[in-house]
Amino acid sequence: MFESFETIRLVVRRMTMGDAQELTAISDVAQVSQWMSFMEGGFPLEKARAMIAAQNETRETFFAVRLRNRALAGALGMVDHPDHSIEIGYWFGLDHQGKGYGYEAVRAYLEQIATDPSLAGRPIIAEAYPDNVASIKLLAKAGFSATSRPGHRPNRIGFALAPRNSVEPKSI
């Protein structure tokens, strides 16, 4: 699996303990944490450290999304489900929302998945709360469509990416 990748404005790499404090700073805000089930009740430093530490023991992987000036803008996540599907997720700090970073990161992430021999060709899914309009718009722009099934977590809409052969990698 890939460790890092870059876009025009972003540097994305596997999350480490060195990211925990900054991750808490951008995530432990109600307007961000309300959309993430694992951040229920907030996202203090202990939760950030536990999430980062667990990624080697679970089928979950997290990536730090940094601007070229090295500021942490957000995070990407991947869950390798037993049914062979890959679930992606993302969140960005308030100061970095609405600037196109989310789409840029997700699009490049999907391109990395499509070219990784261990991941390519597998179904890619995502989910969002019905009232998370920004996330739903981002997923649609990235090529996802709502499915008739709910997400893996309660009260979520399930989304699926168009089949691989209909998604052409493109530069961001």
Regions found by a protein language model. Name each.
Residues 31-52:
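Conserved GNAT-fold acetyl-CoA-binding loop/helix
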